[in-house]
A protein has these predicted regions:
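Conserved Asp/Asn-Gly motif in the active-site loop of CheY-like receiver
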Residues: 38-42, 97, 115
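Receiver (REC) domain active-site loop signature in two-component systems and cognate sites
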Residues: 62
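C-terminal output helix
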Residues: 113-122
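Acidic, metal-coordinating helix/loop segments flanking the phosphotransfer/catalytic sites
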Residues: 37-55
Length: 129
């Protein structure tokens, strides 16, 4: 876990769809996580540079930088390479899933998704971190 309070892990959520961004944030905040939000890829990386999250939930298709590109940049940097990443996407082809894992993602969730399942996956990854 990062330097954040151990009882409130910090989760970065990045999605250009405000409804999904708020749905995910609401669910994870209710579960006790501290949340930071980004509406595009550049904003997501800026937030990471300001405060390392314990986990990132990234939409694949966003303006400026995709979730794949953000994940690759996180993995290439010594200070961020261990941040767990969950990708969210409507892209469901096997090649898209493969691209997600090749970029360094820890999990890949297809939209539409269950907020409860996402919460369980976040918890499972953080429990192993």
């Amino acid at each position: 876990m990062s330097a954040n309070a151990p009882d409130r892990p910090l989760i970065l959520i990045a999605d250009d769809d405000p409804d999904i961004l708020e749905l995910v944030a609401f669910r994870l905040e209710r579960a006790g996580y501290e949340i930071v939000r980004a509406a595009d890829g550049e904003e997501a990386l800026q937030l990471v540079s300001e405060r390392l999250p314990d986990l990132a939930v990234l939409d694949v298709m966003m303006p400026k930088l995709t979730g794949y590109e953000i994940t690759e940049q996180l993995r290439a940097d010594e200070s961020t390479k261990r941040i767990p990443v969950i990708l969210l996407t409507a892209r469901v082809q096997e090649a898209d899933v493969a691209r997600g894992f090749e970029s360094g993602a820890d999990d890949y969730i297809k939209k539409p998704f269950s907020p409860g399942e996402l919460q369980l996956r976040v918890q499972a990854i953080l429990d192993r971190a």
